[in-house]
Amino acid sequence: MGQKVCAHGFRVGPTLIKGWDSVFYAEKQYKTLFIQDLKIRELVNKSFTQAQVSRILIERPSNKSIIININAKKPNIIIGKNGSEIDKLKKAIEKMTSLSEVYINIHEVRKFNIDAAIVAQTIASQLEKRVSFRKAMKTAIQASFKQGGQGIRVSCSGRLGGAEIARTEWYIEGRMPLHTLRADIDYSTAEAITTYGVIGVKVWIYKGEYTENKRYN
């Protein structure tokens, strides 16, 4: 089971080590709010591709307010000069949600080499620049261990190196206990749009076992 299911979704829950990316309570409005959250994430990811966004946590403490926490490798791109970009984003979200109270918090990801989303985006951007997929994967693996990663698994799927037949290449180093629920495993995917077609990138990073003071919210 642990080999097939999404490593992040497998560990989401109040007694497990991962938290939900959307936090709200709604009875009849659930579908509307869920679609709004998807549109907000799409807007942020499309507007700030260079910022390398890792996670977007959306909280709705009341019916009139929304709090958006954005984790990114380059937060300055999202903030913009004198806060111009974040003001544009805030106005766009206010228009989209019809809420008067929109709060946006930007957090910098310092250990970005053990953040699966950022690692996957980095590999994808290198593939788009025609860097060898083997070199991109090996560089990511080495950088991950330097920042404290205990295991990493990377896969690239598609017409690798311009080959006529699509295939999947894997690299794995260190431990990757996918069946262990207390194992803190980060997982993410990315897509590289190349002249040969789309190449899919998947990254799993094992950061160690969960302890009470290491709870990830």
From Swiss-Prot:
GO terms for biological process: translation. Residues 40-110 form the KH type-2 domain. GO terms for molecular function: mRNA binding; rRNA binding; structural constituent of ribosome. Gene3D superfamilies: 3.30.300.20, Ribosomal protein S3, C-terminal domain (3.30.1140.32). Keywords: Ribonucleoprotein, Ribosomal protein, RNA-binding, rRNA-binding. GO terms for cellular component: cytosolic small ribosomal subunit. Part of the 30S ribosomal subunit. Forms a tight complex with proteins S10 and S14. PANTHER family: 30S/40S RIBOSOMAL PROTEIN S3, SMALL RIBOSOMAL SUBUNIT PROTEIN US3C. Belongs to the universal ribosomal protein uS3 family. Binds the lower part of the 30S subunit head. Binds mRNA in the 70S ribosome, positioning it for translation. This is Small ribosomal subunit protein uS3. It comes from Rickettsia bellii (strain OSU 85-389). The lineage of its organism: Bacteria, Pseudomonadati, Pseudomonadota, Alphaproteobacteria, Rickettsiales.
